[in-house]
Amino acid sequence: MNEFPVVLVINCGSSSIKFSVLDASDCEVLMSGIADGINSENAFLSVNGGEPAPLAHHSYEGALKAIAFELEKRNLNDSVALIGHRIAHGGSIFTESAIITDEVIDNIRRVSPLAPLHNYANLSGIESAQQLFPGVTQVAVFDTSFHQTMAPEAYLYGLPWKYYEELGVRRYGFHGTSHRYVSLRAHSLLNLAEDDSGLVVAHLGNGASICAVRNGQSVDTSMGMTPLEGLMMGTRSGDVDFGAMSWVASQTNQSLGDLERVVNKESGLLGISGLSSDLRVLEKAWHEGHERAQLAIKTFVHRIARHIAGHAASLRRLDGIIFTGGIGENSSLIRRLVMEHLAVLGVEIDTEMNNRSNSFGERIVSSENARVICAVIPTNEEKMIALDAIHLGKVNAPAEFA
C-alpha cells in the first residue's frame, strides 16, 4: 500500500476529461484540471487553472496519458491508490457505486444506449486508465444510482407498459452524486437525523434538477429518462408539451433530430432571452432592463419554484430547501426570487445572509422565523466520488464525512 495514497477522480464528457487528485486521508484537492476539445485538432490540457497546452494526441487515451504525465511531474503517479470514474448512466442495473470489473464494464456497455454521448466516453476513460495504472482499484460512481430508490409511481411514465418493459423507458434522474453529497451535508448543517428528515435539493447550473430526499433517500427528481426533462435550463427547454413539438414539426417540416437539437441546444434561457445561456450575462441584462432577459429569468425561477413545491409533496414533511450548483451557490438574485415564490410554504428570506458570497461556504439563508429552512451548500461531486472509491477500496478512509 502507498504510504501517502491519493485518489484520481476522472470525469470523461463527450469531448472533455475533468480530473482531480485528492489526498485519501482528508480528501483535500492536490491538483485538478481539464482536457478539452478531445477528438479535435484543438485539443488542449489545462492544469490547476493554468494556460492551456495543446495535446499531441487528441484521443481520450492521449489526453489521459498527458494527465498521467502531469501527475508524474509532481511525483504523484506512484501514489495513485484508487481511481474513481463518474459514469453518466447506470440504468436500472446499478443502484450504488461499484468496483470496476469485466462484468461491471459489460453492464455499463449494456446501458450505454441510454446515454450514448457520455457513457461510451466514460468507457474510454476506464479502458485508458486501466492501461496507464495497471493493478490500481477503479470504482464507477453513477449519476443515476442515487435515484434508484424511487418508487414505481415516481419513475413510470403514463405510456404503454411495453415501452417500459421492453425498452426501459422510465425516469432515471441525474445529478445523483451532487444530490447525495449535498443532502448528506444538509443533515449535518441543519442538525437533522438522516433517517428522519425531508429535504428538497435544487442543483442549479447550466444543467439543473430538483430532488426530493426523504430519510436520506431520493424519492423523486425532475430529470427523466434523459437530462432534458424538468426545469428550464441554459439551453434545454425542460418540460414541454409533446403535442406542441408535434405541431411545430408539422408546421416547419423539421425532423425529430432537428427538434431534439432545438430543445437541447437552442432553448431554455438562451431560447427565451435570445441573448445568452449564461446566467451571469442575463443578470447583467436584467439590471439594465433587457425585457427578454428578465422574462427568461422569471420563467426559470417560476419553473424552479413550481418543481420545489411539487417535489415537497413526495416528502412526509419539509425540513429544508437546499440550493447548490453554480447558479444555486452564486446567484443571490435567483435564490431571492425563488424564495419569494415559495412564501406559501412558509419560506422567509434573510437578505443579509442571502447576499453573502459563496466564499462563506455552507450557510442558512432563511430568516429565524421561517417555517422551512433554506440553505446554500456548495456541491463537491469529486469528493463524493473519492469517498465512494475510498469506502469500496478500503484505503485509509477519512474519519469524518465533512
From Swiss-Prot:
Reactions the enzyme catalyzes: propanoate + ATP = propanoyl phosphate + ADP
The protein's Enzyme Commission number: 2.7.2.15
UniProt pathway annotation: Amino-acid degradation; L-threonine degradation via propanoate pathway; propanoate from L-threonine: step 4/4
Gene Ontology CC terms, in alphabetical order: cytosol
Alphabetized UniProt keyword annotations: ATP-binding, Kinase, Magnesium, Metal-binding, Nucleotide-binding, Transferase
Catalytic residues, chain numbering: D143 (proton donor/acceptor)
Binding site for Mg(2+): N11
Site entry (Transition state stabilizer), positions: H175, R236
Cofactor dependency: Mg(2+)
Binding annotation for ATP: 11, 18, 175, 203-207, 278-280, 326-330
Protein biosynthesis listed as a keyword: no
Enzyme superclass (EC): transferase
GO biological process, one term: acetate metabolic process
Its job: Catalyzes the conversion of propionyl phosphate and ADP to propionate and ATP.
Family as reported in the entry's similarity comment: Belongs to the acetokinase family. TdcD subfamily.
Official protein name in the record: Propionate kinase
Organism: Escherichia coli O157:H7
Lineage, opening ranks: Bacteria, Pseudomonadati, Pseudomonadota, Gammaproteobacteria, Enterobacterales
Gene name per UniProt: tdcD
